[in-house]
């Protein structure tokens, strides 16, 4: 048994490769925290990447969901680096977390008197880039001014919100995704791109091995985000006594719309 989700009913779980090690981890929300669990974190001594308070916990982040303690979350690799980001909304905030360490990458004030709902990922406008769709209501909005949820990433919460909200990257850097997310237990193989339901469903784990994570894929007529590395080289004389020694220096800039892989070689 794993601790954490016992605070509340526990939200619907997700399965994805959160830390980029090629193996799936799983995550769930409780009334007070969002938890990502990894089998690696059951080892003794625990690996340094495991920063959670309990064995098995890769990381955890403080949240607020006293309404139900059972909200769900979704997962998507927004920047195409083969590491999943977490998308979760509690009573007060929509947040996007870095999969490996739980760093908050994005936050928006979205209030809710929660139940079983969750944000979902889909290309809602057909532009070839994923969007975040999240429901909101004003039931618990007045409770978002306490020490836990009054501010996030330097931004105050403000008044309660309501309605269906869709978020996108204004620079269109998010990777492409399907235009469909058809049910609470969505897992890609349960529905076709045209909304058709397969008579015999293919096993998700044989191809994707995830759960509540939408798939990437280019849409016809749209452009997939790509990295674009440019470099600049400078040579200056050494500051020492010998002016015939020169020290080269260089800078590399990514002017594209997708991240570049770590350890990319460069020559000059």
Which role fits each region the language model picked out?
Residues 220-268:
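Extracellular/luminal regions of secreted and cell-surface proteins that mediate adhesion/ECM remodeling
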Residues 1-224:
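Extracytoplasmic/lumenal domain signature
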């Amino acid at each position: 048994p794993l601790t954490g989700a016992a605070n509340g009913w526990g939200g619907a779980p997700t399965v994805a490769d959160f830390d980029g090690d090629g193996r799936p981890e799983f995550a769930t929300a409780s009334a007070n925290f969002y938890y990502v669990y990894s089998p690696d974190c059951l080892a003794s001594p625990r690996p340094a990447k495991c920063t959670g308070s309990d064995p098995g916990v890769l990381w955890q982040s403080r949240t607020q969901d006293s309404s139900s303690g059972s909200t769900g979350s979704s997962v998507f690799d927004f920047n195409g680096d083969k590491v999943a980001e977490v998308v979760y909304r509690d009573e007060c905030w929509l947040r996007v977390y870095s999969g490996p360490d739980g760093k908050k990458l994005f936050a928006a004030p979205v209030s809710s008197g929660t139940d079983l709902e969750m944000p979902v990922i889909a290309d809602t406008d057909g532009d070839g880039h994923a969007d975040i769709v999240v429901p909101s209501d004003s039931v618990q909005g007045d409770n978002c001014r306490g020490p836990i949820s009054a501010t996030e990433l330097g931004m105050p919460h403000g008044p309660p919100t309501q309605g269906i909200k869709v978020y996108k990257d204004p620079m269109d850097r998010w990777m492409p995704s399907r235009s469909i997310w058809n049910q609470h237990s969505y897992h890609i193989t349960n529905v076709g791109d045209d909304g058709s339901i397969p008579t015999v469903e293919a096993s998700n784990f044989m191809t994707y091995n995830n759960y509540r994570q939408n798939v990437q894929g280019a849409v016809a007529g749209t452009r997939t985000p790509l990295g674009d590395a440019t470099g600049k080289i400078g040579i200056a004389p050494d500051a020492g006594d010998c002016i015939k020694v020169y020290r080269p220096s260089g800078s590399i800039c990514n002017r594209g719309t997708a991240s570049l892989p770590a350890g990319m070689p460069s020559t000059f």
